[in-house]
């Protein structure tokens, strides 16, 4: 409250209103009148009257979008891998002076509960590109780690690589990415599966009244798997 103000017309401006990582909308009213949007209010100071200028600031967290993409290559079909692969998106925030972990759900909200995002339930598969995609909107700006927590397929070795916003490919199952205000942060993972292999050695001994040449022309072998597939020399 400012007293002894000379009579006349005044402009009242809120010059500092921004807070890091927050979006703000400012409204004002003069003498209880209709609310207006803006940071500057025009008001008249009249004799023996009190002119009231009321400002209201509404703050919301700045948010961006996190787009996760998964490509599966090698000796595992996308259908086989879909039931195996899960991800966690995690960040650290300060609450009451202490750093605590928060997880991101498919709706973009932060939760105290460890949350897993699954290829089968949360991602969408594009048959043309062969990629799984999850778009998480309304993610509060900040630093996040995206970890592929389950990736192993029985009988296979797997190599995991990732890239952020189309950058260089890195080896590993955990990517660190920054979500910025109004932008889409793209994190692409690729799993390349290779079946475990060994060596099968066959030996054949020929005895009796037959020559090696005769046996070579007559003897043949087949090797089949449990599901009836044939194995070649390679």
Where are these regions (language model features)?
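Solvent-exposed loop/turn and edge beta-strand elements of beta-rich ligand-binding domains
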Residues: 1-234
């Amino acid at each position: 409250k400012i007293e002894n103000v000379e009579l006349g017309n005044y402009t009242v401006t809120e010059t500092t209103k921004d807070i890091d990582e927050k979006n703000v909308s400012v409204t004002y009213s003069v003498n209880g009148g209709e609310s207006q949007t803006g940071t500057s209010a025009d008001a008249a100071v009249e004799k023996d009257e009190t002119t009231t200028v009321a400002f209201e600031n509404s703050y919301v967290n700045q948010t961006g979008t996190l787009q996760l993409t998964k490509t599966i290559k090698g000796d595992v079909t996308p259908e086989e891998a879909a039931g195996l692969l899960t991800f966690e998106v995690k960040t650290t925030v300060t609450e009451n002076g202490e750093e605590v972990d928060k997880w991101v759900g498919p709706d973009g909200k932060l939760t105290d509960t460890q949350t897993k995002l699954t290829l089968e339930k949360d991602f969408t598969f594009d048959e043309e590109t062969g990629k799984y995609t999850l778009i998480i909107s309304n993610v509060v700006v900040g630093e996040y780690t995206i970890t592929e927590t389950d990736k192993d397929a029985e009988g296979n070795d797997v190599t995991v690589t990732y890239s952020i916003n189309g950058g260089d490919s890195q080896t590993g199952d955990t990517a660190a990415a920054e979500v910025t205000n109004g932008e889409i942060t793209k994190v692409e993972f690729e799993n390349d599966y290779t079946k475990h292999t060994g060596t099968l050695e066959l030996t054949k001994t020929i005895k009796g009244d037959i020559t090696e040449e005769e046996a070579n022309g007559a003897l043949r072998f087949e090797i089949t798997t449990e599901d009836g597939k044939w194995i070649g020399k390679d």
